[in-house]
Amino acid sequence: MTTVSMRDMLQAGVHFGHQTRYWNPKMKPFIFGARNGVHIINLEHTVPMFNEALAFISNIASKKGKVLFVGTKRAAGEAIKASALSCDQYYVDHRWLGGMLTNWKTVRQSIKRLKELESQSVDGTFDKLTKKEALMRSRELDKLEKSLGGIKNMGGLPDVLFVIGADHEHIAIKEANNLGIPVVAVVDTNSAPDGVNYIVPGNDDAMRAIRLYTSSVAAAANAGRGQDLAVQAEQDGFVEAV
């Protein structure tokens, strides 16, 4: 089972919160104290809470569940995308479009258009168009890929959201809440943990911390999928033996 240690978190700077004047009182139970005007997060809480979240994600992946990685802050985008791809899951790394979950029917139409344009870009259709029309379609393709590329093969709503920065991604969290989709989120000292099912109190800005979260979630998802494949292989073997 994928777990993260206290040492891993200390080395990544997970314990460094925001300046004390920006704190959200709802995060008080998870704050150890302050140093040089900066809140220090109590990792005695974070370690077990994150490991519990990892076990939950692994369990969902073991049942062929879909994990949607969400992190549109500049510091998070790259790690979100790389980690989601490393475990064959899905991501939103650029901008959360309002209604991405709650208006899935419309989003599905946009994904269909994205796939049409992708086909046209490789089957020679673009070459048959005027320069202006080809450029317009190419720009449309780039725009759609940027916003929907990470979910184009999701094939339906996700089974869990993994979010970096609860404050920054509050719209995504609200949509998940409305649909009953569980949320795992990194919540810094300046944020409210409202609507988060699995709170991970921690720094949501430092790239080392973000990479620790995303790579651990990817490892947990891969471990879960490994369990699923092992069970499947066992069942296949059993069927063959009969």
Swiss-Prot record:
GO biological process terms held by the UniProt record = translation
Record carries keyword Ribonucleoprotein: yes
Entries under CDD domains matching the protein: RPS2 (cd01425)
Q: Which GO terms describe its cellular component?
A: cytosolic small ribosomal subunit
Question: Which UniProt keywords are listed?
Answer: Ribonucleoprotein, Ribosomal protein
Among HAMAP family, the record links this protein to: Ribosomal_uS2_B
NCBIfam families assigned: rpsB_bact
Query: Could you identify this protein by its name?
Result: Small ribosomal subunit protein uS2
Species for this entry: Shewanella frigidimarina (strain NCIMB 400)
